UniProtKB/Swiss-Prot annotation:
<comment type="subunit">
    <text>Homodimer.</text>
</comment>
<dbReference type="InterPro" id="IPR004030">
    <property type="entry name" value="NOS_N"/>
</dbReference>
<dbReference type="InterPro" id="IPR044943">
    <property type="entry name" value="NOS_dom_1"/>
</dbReference>
<dbReference type="GO" id="GO:0006809">
    <property type="term" value="P:nitric oxide biosynthetic process"/>
</dbReference>
<protein>
    <recommendedName>
        <fullName>Nitric oxide synthase oxygenase</fullName>
        <ecNumber>1.14.14.47</ecNumber>
    </recommendedName>
</protein>
<keyword id="KW-0408">Iron</keyword>
<dbReference type="InterPro" id="IPR044944">
    <property type="entry name" value="NOS_dom_3"/>
</dbReference>
<keyword id="KW-0479">Metal-binding</keyword>
<dbReference type="GO" id="GO:0046872">
    <property type="term" value="F:metal ion binding"/>
</dbReference>
<comment type="function">
    <text>Catalyzes the production of nitric oxide.</text>
</comment>
<dbReference type="InterPro" id="IPR044940">
    <property type="entry name" value="NOS_dom_2"/>
</dbReference>
<dbReference type="GO" id="GO:0004517">
    <property type="term" value="F:nitric-oxide synthase activity"/>
</dbReference>
<dbReference type="InterPro" id="IPR017142">
    <property type="entry name" value="Nitric_oxide_synthase_Oase-su"/>
</dbReference>
<dbReference type="GO" id="GO:0020037">
    <property type="term" value="F:heme binding"/>
</dbReference>
<keyword id="KW-0560">Oxidoreductase</keyword>
<feature type="binding site" description="axial binding residue">
    <location>
        <position position="62"/>
    </location>
    <ligand>
        <name>heme</name>
    </ligand>
</feature>
<dbReference type="InterPro" id="IPR050607">
    <property type="entry name" value="NOS"/>
</dbReference>
Length: 358
């Protein structure tokens, strides 16, 4: 079974990279021997890098796949000690942030006996009983159990919670200067500033498995950049997240939220305008939902030229604001899951997040 998965990946990758049949057969022969001797096999650095890029390209829920080949891959399979691990995490955050000019990065640790990360994302806000991000209550309780104490605000950056092999679970507070955040304001509605809203610059997913040719990498944090609606529609407005619709509408001086007033819709549009322009004002990369949809159209054309079928999950590719203005909305997608890919960990069954845009 493992060899068949390895064979499918190697043949696919090596043909895309224009390797001769003789080289492909030699590599497959070596892998088959290694599996017979050890029960597994080890990817070359080139295979790891290209496999990670293919995983992004195959991510059905991601609208930002046009840039799959620009992914920066850090091979951290040799990282085993705590100092090196924390240094590699800080390095990833710094390089991905890039002073606001965000770059897509993935750091891949060993498939076995590597460090374990308990956070859903490397950077997220704590969730308390009466404030913060309700989606992070479980991680916040774990952090508190380990001795971490937040300030009790809506936007306390959670520490990194991790475990090295044969060691206890620990937490690590990031240097304040490492985490770039964007205060949210609206140039036409100054009252919005009084809500003291902000959001972190880089979404770095850390609760998914990366699978390449049958080998699972359980710790492989990765990032792209935000699509504006992920913050302005989902994170701030969903009633199981920050649930800010009424407060935002009040800041915009909308006197009613009756359904037939259309003020709920207006509030969403104005808040997304505020998020987008706040990020741009701070020099932080972000994409609006209509541009992202156009980029996905280009991705589809590029893939068609290469003779590859684009798979996708329609409900994720149609943005949550004005979806009918995008081509994604108007046709279906084959949701077949290809390998390599990113997979939700089984214990995280409620973690419905897009790999590169959440």
């Amino acid at each position: 079974m493992l060899f068949k998965e390895a064979q499918a990946f190697i043949e696919n990758m090596y043909k895309e990279c224009h390797y001769e049949t003789q080289i492909i057969n030699k590599r497959l022969h070596d892998i088959e021997l290694e599996i017979k001797e050890t029960g597994t096999y080890t990817h070359t650095e080139e295979e790891l890098i290209y496999g990670a890029k293919m995983a992004w390209r195959n991510s059905n829920r991601c609208i930002g796949r046009l840039f799959w080949d620009s992914l920066n891959v850090i091979d951290a399979r040799d990282v085993t000690d705590e100092a090196s691990f924390l240094s590699s995490i800080n390095y990833h955050i710094a390089q991905a942030t890039n002073e606001g000019k965000l770059k897509p990065y993935i750091t891949i640790y060993a498939p076995k006996d590597g460090p374990k990360i308990f956070n859903n994302q490397l950077i997220r806000y704590a969730g308390y009983d009466n404030c913060g991000d309700p989606a992070e209550k479980e991680v916040t309780r774990l952090a508190n159990h380990l001795g971490w104490k937040g300030k009790g605000t809506n936007f306390d950056v959670l520490p990194l919670i991790y475990q090295l092999p044969n060691e206890s679970v620990k937490y690590y507070e990031y240097p304040t200067s490492l985490i770039k955040e964007v205060p949210i304001e609206h140039d036409h509605y100054p009252k919005l500033r009084k809500l003291n809203l902000k959001w972190y610059a880089v979404p770095i997913i850390s609760n998914m498995d990366l699978k390449i040719g049958g080998i699972v990498y359980p710790t492989a944090p990765f990032n792209g950049w935000y699509m504006v609606t992920e913050i302005g529609v989902r994170n701030f407005i969903d009633d199981y997240r920050y649930n800010l619709l009424e407060k935002v509408a009040d800041a915009f001086e909308f006197d009613t939220l009756k359904n037939n007033s259309f003020n709920k819709d207006r509030a969403l549009v104005e808040l997304n305008y505020a998020v987008y322009h706040s990020f741009k004002k701070e020099g932080v990369s972000i994409v609006d939902h209509l541009t992202a949809a156009k980029q996905f159209e280009l991705f589809e054309r590029n893939e068609a030229q290469q003779g590859r079928q684009v798979t996708g999950k329609w409900s994720w590719l149609a943005p949550p604001l004005s979806p009918t203005l995008t081509s994604n909305y108007h046709h279906g997608y084959d949701n077949t899951v290809k390998d390599p890919n990113f997979f939700y960990k089984k214990k995280k069954s409620n973690a419905n997040q897009c790999p590169f845009h959440h």
